[in-house]
């Protein structure tokens, strides 16, 4: 199911306020982030040695990553009993490759992140900001206890943010939803993309409008990828969108979904601008603009990824924004990652809250990514035009 809601004027704020519990800048001084979160000067952290990084990419708050601890790090902090979502901040300080620093993270006696390779997790980049959120950590003895265990080289940590779960604001008013409770896809809201393989991201699948790939049954939308020879491809799948039919500027967007698993799968719940040429400088009005090498509509006009999941890292959910100023080719992509249980076995709610001031992304109301409007130009914030839903499963490609 999917839903879109708007915040009623004068009824509060969509900002992720009120969920803050404790935050520290490891090895560094106190700092207030662009979204207003106050990180304290390091406390409650022992062991390891303090280091520094001169230049950081991929974050609106690079100061948080300029200091870090390396070694057998421990965190022991008094905190009220309860359930917390913990965001760990990392940046690889050394020019090393994938597999050259690997460690585990433990909280309250249990392993919460296994085989954490900062370079691998950050798209094989060093000196780039990485956040990993672990939800539902239960503290029952009045103290939060975290420690790190090395597998290869020494663990590192740049900052730590501890949150309580906040309820969804009652100020949202539902403006559109699709529960997929009919017998077929509602074509007044949805359209298919029918594409050959390799059109974007070097993906292996052909997108079709066949019911084998996209259908509504038993009260659910089903998007299904198949290994088969079809139209020059070795796989088929489905991709649908609401462009020109259900376009939205700001609001809360929710999708309840169960994801496919397996190496090579790359499902996504995401949004593109409904007028992709708003900030394009090299093209205008090209109907087939996606994957067009001479058109800079992407990344100029933006992209919001509410959920991406790649099969080789099951249960790792990614939320991302793409802009001209900050995208992957420049090592400056702004993104967050959360680890959940049963992404391919259970339904979870993937959500976006989007206002003129900021973008926040959630899974099951666990807040794990924020991007703030810096008040500069369209290059940093193209998110002032209507966007539309896209649902798809890619196969293979540059990431899958």
Where are these regions (language model features)?
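Sec-dependent signal peptide recognition
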Residues: 1-5
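C-terminal motif of bacterial Sec signal peptides marking the signal peptidase cleavage site
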Residues: 9-10
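Compositionally biased, intrinsically disordered/low-complexity regions enriched for serine, proline
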Residues: 6, 75-77, 132, 152, ...
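Generic structural microfeature
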Residues: 6, 19-21, 83, 100, ...
């Amino acid at each position: 199911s999917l839903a879109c809601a708007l915040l009623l004027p004068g009824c509060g704020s969509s900002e992720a306020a009120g969920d803050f519990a404790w935050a520290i800048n490891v090895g560094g001084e106190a700092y207030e982030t662009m979204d207003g979160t106050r990180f304290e000067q390091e406390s409650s952290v022992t062991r390891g040695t303090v280091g520094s990084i001169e230049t950081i990419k991929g974050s609106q708050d690079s100061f948080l990553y300029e200091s870090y601890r390396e070694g057998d790090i421990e965190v022991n902090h008094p905190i009220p009993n309860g359930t917390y979502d913990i965001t760990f901040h990392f940046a690889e300080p050394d020019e090393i490759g994938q597999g050259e620093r690997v460690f585990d993270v433990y909280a309250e006696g249990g392993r919460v992140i296994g085989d954490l390779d900062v370079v691998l997790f950050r798209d094989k980049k060093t000196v780039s900001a990485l956040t990993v959120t672990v939800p539902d950590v239960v503290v029952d003895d009045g103290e939060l206890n975290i420690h790190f265990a090395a597998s290869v080289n020494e663990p590192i940590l740049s900052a730590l943010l501890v949150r309580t779960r906040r309820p969804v604001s009652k100020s949202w008013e539902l403006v559109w939803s699709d529960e997929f409770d009919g017998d077929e896809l509602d074509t007044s809201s949805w359209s298919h993309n029918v594409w050959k393989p390799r059109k974007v991201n070097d993906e292996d699948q052909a997108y079709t409008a066949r019911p084998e790939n996209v259908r509504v049954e038993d009260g659910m939308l089903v998007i299904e990828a198949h290994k088969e020879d079809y139209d020059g491809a070795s796989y088929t799948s489905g991709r649908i969108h609401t462009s020109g039919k259900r376009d939205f500027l700001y609001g809360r967007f929710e999708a309840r979904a169960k994801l496919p698993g397996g190496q090579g799968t790359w499902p996504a719940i995401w949004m593109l601008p409904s007028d992709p040429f708003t900030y394009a400088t090299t093209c205008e009005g090209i109907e087939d603009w996606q994957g067009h090498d001479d058109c800079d509509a992407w990344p100029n006009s933006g992209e919001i990824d509410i959920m991406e999941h790649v099969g080789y890292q099951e249960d790792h959910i990614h939320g991302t924004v793409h802009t001209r100023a900050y995208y992957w080719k420049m090592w400056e992509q702004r993104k967050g990652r959360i680890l959940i249980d049963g992404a391919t076995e259970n339904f979870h709610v993937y959500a976006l809250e989007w206002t003129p001031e900021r973008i926040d992304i959630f899974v099951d109301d666990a807040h794990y990514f924020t991007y703030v409007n810096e008040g500069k130009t369209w290059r940093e914030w193209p998110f002032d035009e209507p966007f539309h839903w896209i649902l798809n499963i890619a196969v293979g490609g540059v990431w899958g």
